[in-house]
Amino acid sequence: MSFKMTQNQYTSLYGPTVGDSIRLGDTNLFAQIEKDYAVYGEEATFGGGKSIRDGMAQNPRVTRDDVNVADLVISNAVIIDYDKVVKADIGIKNGYIFAIGNAGNPDIMDNVDIIIGSTTDIIAAEGKIVTAGGIDTHVHFINPEQAEVALESGITTHIGGGTGASEGSKATTVTPGPWHIHRMLEAAEGLPINVGFTGKGQATNPTALIEQINAGAIGLKVHEDWGATPSALSHALDVADEFDVQIALHADTLNEAGFMEDTMAAVKDRVLHMYHTEGAGGGHAPDLIKSAAFSNILPSSTNPTLPYTHNTVDEHLDMVMITHHLNAAIPEDIAFADSRIRKETIAAEDVLQDMGVFSMISSDSQAMGRVGEVITRTWQVAHRMKEQRGPLDGDFEHNDNNRIKRYIAKYTINPAITHGISEYVGSIEPGKLADIVLWDPIFFGVKPELVVKGGLINSAVNGDANGSIPTSEPMKYRKMYGQYGGNLTSTSMTFVSKTAYENGINRALNLKRMVRPVKNIRQLSKADMKNNSATPKLDVDPQTYEVYVDGENITSNAATELPLTQRYFLF
């Protein structure tokens, strides 16, 4: 006979189900479950007296050789991804996601997609949220400790450039030349995250660019501090087209070599990743923002100006001066910094993100941005925009799924698509590396409970190692076994160009990590940006800097209070 329980009883045992809503942190956002893969009454749960025991939800006969037997099951998780908000079990094998569905023992249970056997471990996710590991595509590799800070925020992939604390690295996300690229590929062997490095994109001799792609760069960065001229940009794009890599552009703030229109004329119809498209991080003043209307531009913006608050403008001048090696005693340097900080375009940035005109969010780490705040600031923007603009079309009370899917895509699948790594990472889908972040809903967007990297727990909140239980204070982030021994190399990927991959860069440098080629980049357009592909007409008033979308002035009010802030950081 069947057993009936109340909704509250069910939720406390197995987590929310279809129609239930979860508040994300202390924001005003609610995720509503669209589908539950569980068979009611046959949910697989672990623990004393629970169902995952021998002969029950754990199959006693099968071995690991069965392709449907998981190494790890994340049970009863609420999965939030760019295309779904569902309740499901996640099956992981050999470090990769192989199934999303219902886990258990098919001998006695119905509709089992994932077999739990004697070789299977369990992460209990009842009442928890699971997301794909985040991808930050604007990283200045200045300090190796950035990787740990980012990991503890839910970021599992870094793309950018640098060689350490050099002036070039502090300013330009560039790893210049084969020697530096090889050294950074070797250094990545000791990092607990996936990485890809961008070379320097300034050269009229294509050989100087090609040798960097051959050395393993996944693309080229054209930056104004090295000279973002139309000529340099065009040459870099020529090489990118030949080798199927991405170009990242920090355009010409001073308009020395041309205006925004000249840059777009040099680009033609070729795809590129436009960094900090709002312009405070750099780029044609005051109208770089107009580039987001082009179908071949994949626009991102960076977290120092997100969301717009009453402190944003004041803090930026000093950041620009330090990052770009400017001299406060030189009036022209002060004018350069001032030209980038425009409250009107900053106020429009949040709205453009909310409309899906800007497709991605990244950090600009230690070069005006904060490497551990990409995810937090993304959800703060989403909260502010719901507060100011109301629900998105299709959303309603206690269901912000459309907005949630739009915003999570900005730091997961869209960066992966942009840089040619979406075959490997960027979403919770079968066939992808199991880079998975587990959140208590109360702490969503701020502090993950644990991070699974390549199928193994890499970082987790855990108590005193001498405690009698794992929750003995002090509870803090601690390295897990995914960061020890050979696991550092067996659970993370290093991304390289296809030509470097085919020529055996892993063997040439004796790399132990999983080395994978970037691919399918040059045919991209903004239409490929999930939930963030809008291309309206954009204009900027050259006198007032006001931003217009299809003729309508857009702006936002400076926030004086935000969620996901001080109540989460008392200690």
From Swiss-Prot:
It comes from Staphylococcus aureus (strain JH9). GO terms for cellular component: cytoplasm. One of its GO terms (biological process) is urea catabolic process. Its cofactor is Ni cation. Keywords: Cytoplasm, Hydrolase, Metal-binding, Nickel. It holds the Pfam family Amidohydro_1. Pathway: Nitrogen metabolism; urea degradation; CO(2) and NH(3) from urea (urease route): step 1/1. The modification N6-carboxylysine is found at residue 221. Binds 2 nickel ions per subunit. It comes from the Bacteria. CDD domains: Urease_alpha. The active site is at 324 (proton donor). Ni(2+) 2 binds at residues 221, 250, 276. This is Urease subunit alpha. Substrate binds at residue 223. Carboxylation allows a single lysine to coordinate two nickel ions. Belongs to the metallo-dependent hydrolases superfamily. Urease alpha subunit family. InterPro entries: Amidohydro-rel, Metal-dep_hydrolase_composite, Metal_Hydrolase, Urease_alpha_N_dom, Urease_alpha_subunit, Urease_AS, Urease_asu, Urease_asu_c. It is an enzyme of class 3 (hydrolase). Ni(2+) 1 binds at residues 138, 140, 221, 364. SUPFAM superfamilies: Composite domain of metallo-dependent hydrolases (SSF51338), Metallo-dependent hydrolases (SSF51556). It is found in: Cytoplasm. Heterotrimer of UreA (gamma), UreB (beta) and UreC (alpha) subunits. Three heterotrimers associate to form the active enzyme. It catalyses: urea + 2 H2O + H(+) = hydrogencarbonate + 2 NH4(+). GO terms for molecular function: nickel cation binding; urease activity.
